[in-house]
Amino acid sequence: MLHRYLPMTEEDKQQMLQTIGVQSIDELFSDIPESVRFQGEYNIKPAKSEPELMKELMALAAKNADMKTHTSFLGAGVYDHYIPTIVDHVISRSEFYTAYTPYQPEISQGELQAIFEFQTMICELTGMDVANSSMYDGGTALAEAALLSAAHTKKKKVLLSNAVHPEYRDVVKTYAKGPGLEVVEIPYKNGVTDLAALQAEMNEDVACVIVQYPNFFGQIEPLKDIEPIAHAHKGMFVVASNPLALGVLTPPGQFGADIVVGDAQPFGIPAQFGGPHCGYFAVKSALMRKIPGRLVGQTTDEEGRRGFVLTLQAREQHIRRDKATSNICSNQALNALAASVAMTALGKNGVKEMATMNIQKAHYAKEAFVSRGFHVVFEGPFFNEFVIRMNKPIAEVNKKLLEKGIIGGYDLGRNYPELQNCMLIAVTELRTKEEIDTLVKELGDYNA
């Protein structure tokens, strides 16, 4: 069993050496002078058998704290949601198991239809006209939205709310360096974008205004009030949104958003360090020919049968690299399929019910913290996340929680100096009353 997972026998080696006309490994590398060859013993452990290797790897994996072994109240862009069991079954099928979008429609109708359904459901959730087949994640989707806005308006200034996810903001700034865009961060006030500060920065040079809905603090941004400011000087209105929240919130498209992006992770994609995720990108029809990424369209063949194809490909870098709207090629088709299967399994009513449960449980948790004497930092309407202030450093608090089998909330002091000792708590539909009560008790006892 020693070499079960590395089937290279001495006979195999000799056959290969004979094929290339040498007698030994030393002869194969005879061109390398002795003076530069490594001398001495290699500091490499002996090979393990497969059972030994599996045992060691399982022991290493057991050191991880994950959402199967711990109760999680950590969100901040990655959430612990229910994933219907059918999701893994479907995406594991060999005809689906790829991250690529198919170039040959005649042999890929099933996958193309699944992607088309993903695009359709994203449009329904966001209230937009066209959605692409996926982006890498929410951050890169938002950055591409900034680039599209600048290219469409021929302007260079991007107004980015400070209440947008910090990592999304970092990605936008990175993407902005190439074309030389100026990114101006707009401060928040009472947990949402400061409209007075936004108004003060608006001028003819603004390509777009970017906000998040719900924002990083879980608060619901007043899109109705932001839209006229964004469009006052013919700029674009860009909204990054949690798609699950759109099961109950008014879609950004109904507030006049030009571009809606986000991360489909809440639908069928496990929460794991480093991803992968699945970004979505939706626009009004006027921007259809400038949207980045792949588009699947519906058509009919010569016999009148419905079919699906990649459409408007002249926008893409594999057709006209120098004139492409984006350099994205391979995307997250497999995760888009997972999101599509999850949304289909839940159905419209299921998505709404799941979103409603998030709201109800998060608000129960907030009231429980208030009853225990905690200060809730922002008092506006929120979805499934809210901010509390502790008397002690959040890193220290979370270490104690981890010892109790609880993954605590996000330490906002890492990104917002004014929010030191503030924790962003996420409560999804999977959290029970008992789990919430336990968190409140543990934090209350530790905060005393």
UniProtKB/Swiss-Prot annotation:
Reactions catalysed according to its record: N(6)-[(R)-lipoyl]-L-lysyl-[glycine-cleavage complex H protein] + glycine + H(+) = N(6)-[(R)-S(8)-aminomethyldihydrolipoyl]-L-lysyl-[glycine-cleavage complex H protein] + CO2
Keyword check for Oxidoreductase: yes
EC supergroup of this enzyme: oxidoreductase
Assigned keywords, A-Z: Oxidoreductase
GO molecular function: glycine dehydrogenase (decarboxylating) activity
The keyword Transport appears for this protein: no
Enzyme nomenclature, EC number: 1.4.4.2
Cross-referenced Pfam families: GDC-P
Biological process (GO), any one: nucleoside metabolic process
Xref: PANTHER family: GLYCINE CLEAVAGE SYSTEM P-PROTEIN (PTHR42806), GLYCINE DEHYDROGENASE (DECARBOXYLATING) (PTHR42806:SF1)
Record note on quaternary structure: The glycine cleavage system is composed of four proteins: P, T, L and H. In this organism, the P 'protein' is a heterodimer of two subunits.
Functional note: The glycine cleavage system catalyzes the degradation of glycine. The P protein binds the alpha-amino group of glycine through its pyridoxal phosphate cofactor; CO(2) is released and the remaining methylamine moiety is then transferred to the lipoamide cofactor of the H protein.
HAMAP family: GcvPA
Stated name of the protein: Probable glycine dehydrogenase (decarboxylating) subunit 1
